[in-house]
Amino acid sequence: MLKKEWDYVNKILKKIKNIRNLLQDESMYVIIVYDVNVSRVNKIKSFLRKHLNWVQNSVFEGEVTKAEFERIKDGILRIIDEDEDSVIIYQFPLNFMPKREILGLEKNPIDDII
């Protein structure tokens, strides 16, 4: 095989690999609850607002891909002090439909909740 043909084949194989990765990148629904030191509250809140929907104090939720979920976890770990702060992440497959019931005031109504 000529170098030009070999380069073309490698280019096609890379595209196939990228497509395969996209197809395997399933989405999920996550709920993140955090209790962090007051000095880090604004950092974690600002970071999570970029990825998820704010529900109420210290609670975010939304649909994310596996790749985005990993980026969110990495970002959280860069912000928190693991010896002092606590973050709980609930993961649900998209076909799982939990019932959501609000008692009292709904702090931030969202139309497209699971």
Swiss-Prot record:
Binding site for Mg(2+): 35
Cofactor: Mg(2+)
GO molecular function, one term: RNA endonuclease activity
Keywords: Antiviral defense, Endonuclease, Hydrolase, Magnesium, Metal-binding, Nuclease
Broad class of enzyme this protein falls into: hydrolase
A Pfam family that the UniProt record links to this protein: CRISPR_Cas2
Disulfide bonds, paired cysteine numbers: none
Gene Ontology biological-process annotations: defense response to virus; maintenance of CRISPR repeat elements
HAMAP family: Cas2
Role noted for this protein: CRISPR (clustered regularly interspaced short palindromic repeat), is an adaptive immune system that provides protection against mobile genetic elements (viruses, transposable elements and conjugative plasmids). CRISPR clusters contain sequences complementary to antecedent mobile elements and target invading nucleic acids. CRISPR clusters are transcribed and processed into CRISPR RNA (crRNA). Functions as a ssRNA-specific endoribonuclease. Involved in the integration of spacer DNA into the CRISPR cassette.
Family affiliation: Belongs to the CRISPR-associated endoribonuclease Cas2 protein family.
Name of protein: CRISPR-associated endoribonuclease Cas2
High-level lineage: Archaea, Methanobacteriati, Methanobacteriota, Methanomada group, Methanococci
